Amino acid sequence: MTNKNKLTTKEFLMPFILITSLFFLWGIAHGMIDTLDKHFQQILNLKKWQSSFIQFSLYGAYFVMALPAGYFMRRFGYKKGIILGLSLFAAGAFLIAGTTSFESFWIFLTCLFILGSGLATLETAANPYSTKLGPQESAARRINFAQSFNGLAWIIGPLIGLYIYGNQNNAAGEKLTSMILPLSIIGLVVLTVALIFTRLPLPEITEEEVGLGHGIDVSGVEDKPSFHKPLINQPHFVLGVVAQFCYVAAQTGIFSYLINFVTDESQYPRFEVKNGPYFLSIGFALFMIGRMSGSYIMGFVKPTRVLALYSALCILLLPVVSLEMGWFSLIALYVVFFLMSIMFPTIFALGIKDLGPKTKKAASFIVMAVVGGAIFPPLMGWISDIYTMSVGFFAPIPLFLFILYYSLKGHQVKA
C-alpha cells in the first residue's frame, strides 16, 4: 500500500487514536438523547412536535457555537478547542443531573444547550483535525473510520436510555430523576478525558499545513486557485453546507422518531414503549456497520459514487416506510439507518476539500449546518401529530434529493 493510500501515517497514529476517542464520547450523548423524546412525551404529556424541542436545543447549540468555536481554535489551536468542548460537555451533563428534581422541561432544555455547545465545539475541532492526520487522498476514509466509533457509541447511548425508561412504575418526578446517575457518570468521564488532554502533547496543525496535506507529495498544491478565493465563491463548500443541513435534518428526524414509529398505535408491528431503546440500538448498530463498511468500500470506490448510491436508495425506501407495510416498513427503515451512515463525514470531507488556510473557518460553517437537526424534527413531528407517525417519514425525501444532487455535481471544486 502506497503512502497516499494509508489511513494515516506513523507520525500521526497516536493523535489519530486520541481524536477518535472523542467521536466515541459525543456519540454516547447523541444516542442517549435520541431516546428521550418518547420519555418526555409520556412524563409531561407533550405532543411529538413539542418533544422535538430536545433536538432544537441540542442542534441549536451547534448553530450558535460553531463560529465562536472556530474563532477560538484559529486563535488558540485545536488542542485548547478540544479541552473547551470537553469542559462544556461535562458542565452540561452535571447541570442536567442536578436539575431534574425541578421537573421542568425548559430547565432541561437550557442545560442541554450547554451540553450541546460542548459537542459543537468538539465536532468543530475533531472533524477537520481527523482529515489532516494523514494523506489528503485518504481524508474521506479517515473521517469515516473515526466516525465509525461514533456509530459504536450511538449503540451504547440507547442502552443508557433503557435505564431511564426502566423507572416506569415511579411518580413523574422520580422518573425524571432516573437521569441523575447516567448523566453524572458521563460528566465524570468527560471531565477526566479533558484533564488527560491537558497533559498530552498533540501536534498543532497550522493554517498553512492544513492546506498542504501531511505526508504526501504537495508539489503545486500551494498554487491551487481555490486556496485564494473567498469561501462564498467556492460552490462545493456552499453547497456542502446546504447538503450537510439537509443530511442532519433528515438524520435527526429519523433517529428521533424511530421509537415513536415502533410504538405507534396505528403501526404494525407495535411494541411496548419500554422496549423502544432496544430498537433504536439495532438501528444504530446498522449505522455503525455502515460506517465501517463504507470506510472500507471508499478504498476502492469514489466517495461521491457511494454517497450518490446511498442517497438514491434512501429516496426509494422512505415511501416503503411511510406506507405502513408491516415488517417491510420496519426493515426498510433499518436499511435507511445503514445507508445514512457515511453521509455526514463524506459531505464534510467534500465540503472542506482544497480550501487550504480557510479550512478551520469552513469547518465551522459546515458544523453550523447541523442546525438542520433543530429545525426539521418539529416539522416532522407536526406532520405526525396531524396524520400518523408513518406519514411523517415522507418528509425527509426532498432532503435526500438534494444530497443526491450534491454527490453527482455539487461537490465539484471549481477552478
Place the predicted regions along the sequence by residue.
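Extracytoplasmic gate region of multi-pass secondary transporters
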Residues: 33-34, 157-158, 229-281
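Hydrophobic core of transmembrane alpha-helices in multi-pass small-molecule transporters
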Residues: 105-122, 328-343
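Helix-loop-helix hairpin linking two adjacent transmembrane segments in secondary transporters
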Residues: 136-137, 142-202
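Intracellular juxtamembrane helix-capping segments at the cytosolic ends
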Residues: 121-135, 341-356
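C-terminal ends and interior cores of transmembrane alpha-helices
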Residues: 87-102, 312-325
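Extracytoplasmic
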Residues: 14-42, 126-127, 157, 254-262
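Central cavity-lining transmembrane alpha-helices of secondary-active solute carriers
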Residues: 53-71, 281-293, 372
